[in-house]
């Protein structure tokens, strides 16, 4: 039997080409994930540094300044310190619930980054139910807090977990009703479609102007979901020591710390996507890609500009949340529940009815 060497070389070349395509396909999938993970990490470190600097300025004191230039590496130094601290476990607590609780809180928040359109064609998963996926997955985080509080075998921790669950239920409903109103205006539950629906009229096409009541309710509910002052009842120092975090130390305590800032970042991103036009530039009748005269599919420069615009709007909301934390006092538990059930819920429901009526009359 005679083997044609030319055919063998062709087969080898074809197999190498197929292998190269497979490797390239894997890298093409992993690259956006790695970029977003790196971006999230840097963003969390930046938020911590900004909060410390802003709070120091408001209180007329010197903020972090020793770790790195202007103290930018202080958050990284604190995280490294927590990694090497002893991981204590309560002797009479439920070890499994105590250990799983922080992981559930962090993972449930990280999953929601899948549906955030940072720029055109730069979203990990464009789902038809993107905003509802965020609401559904974010509802799992309080379960982790409740597990942590119960597994700690500590009355302060358990009360903190119960408060977290009650607070989440109270403010999840107004938040969902506001998202429904936005979905009715955009005729879609996809985050990408919601951003596209706001792109036609530039600055005046933002849902902020079409849904002012919904924007205020969404803003307050987002702060409550993030457990930020004045809504940090689950970890009130004067009443519950540290709430559900009382018995935690080391890396597990660090996970809760990271989860709070991850939740704040994802809430800020959704404020940008739902109400501030996402990555769209604020010039009427001119889209981002027409403005820079670049190709939508392959314009790396355009994608970078879109990410920058999204982050600029996001950090504007972050600045508001930081200012709110250091200016307003903490609410009582009854005040917090009354605000959610007696004020925000009726307002968000009325806003949804008005939006539905306007959409019906416009048909």
From Swiss-Prot:
The chain crosses the membrane at residues 28-48, 98-118, 129-149, 253-273, 300-320, 336-356. GO terms for biological process: aerobic respiration; photosynthesis, light reaction. GO terms for cellular component: chloroplast thylakoid membrane. The keyword NADP applies. It catalyses: a plastoquinone + NADH + (n+1) H(+)(in) = a plastoquinol + NAD(+) + n H(+)(out); a plastoquinone + NADPH + (n+1) H(+)(in) = a plastoquinol + NADP(+) + n H(+)(out). NDH is composed of at least 16 different subunits, 5 of which are encoded in the nucleus. Belongs to the complex I subunit 1 family. This is NAD(P)H-quinone oxidoreductase subunit 1, chloroplastic. It comes from Lotus japonicus. The lineage of its organism: Eukaryota, Viridiplantae, Streptophyta, Embryophyta, Tracheophyta.
